[in-house]
Amino acid sequence: TFEPIQERTEWAYKKSLLNEYNDSESNILSVANNQRILHDFVFGRDLEFENLPIQKRPKTYFPHRTKTTLRYSFENEQIIALNQQIEIDLTLEFNAVVAIFEAKNGTLKDFNIYQIYHPFLYYYSSNLPLQNIICCYLLRNENSLKFFAYTFEKPLQLDSIKFLKSKEYILRKD
């Protein structure tokens, strides 16, 4: 059994764009993190974004899986993927821009486009007032992190992928 609650605090909760968009266990962690409740509970009061309303703060949504039906095209072929399972490693949201992440360990030469396209299409089809969706691959090696960003110029076309930018962060151990 859990121990009794030692303290109760009323917390001003302001719903954000993707809060409660899915009902996964990781989403509630995301909401608690984005509302800075996790920080308050573990570390005490958070002053980093004290002067910004919660809607203006960057938000993190942890890994989750969901199922949905996706409709799109590849070259001239129409595709309907019924009850398609989608796994999203991480989602960031800031000012109506959503960045989805697919993370891999090791050195890869290429990737499966579906790993970023299906999450892209999931958010694109959500009817949420999003301004932009950025798809990111993160490759982790022993001493570096490599990031690659893409989007889709024609959201309903799998083959409209567009490279945006890349950057490697070399991790220096001091």
Language-model regions: role of each:
Residues T1-Y114, H118-D174:
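Charged, terminal alpha-helix-loop-beta segments
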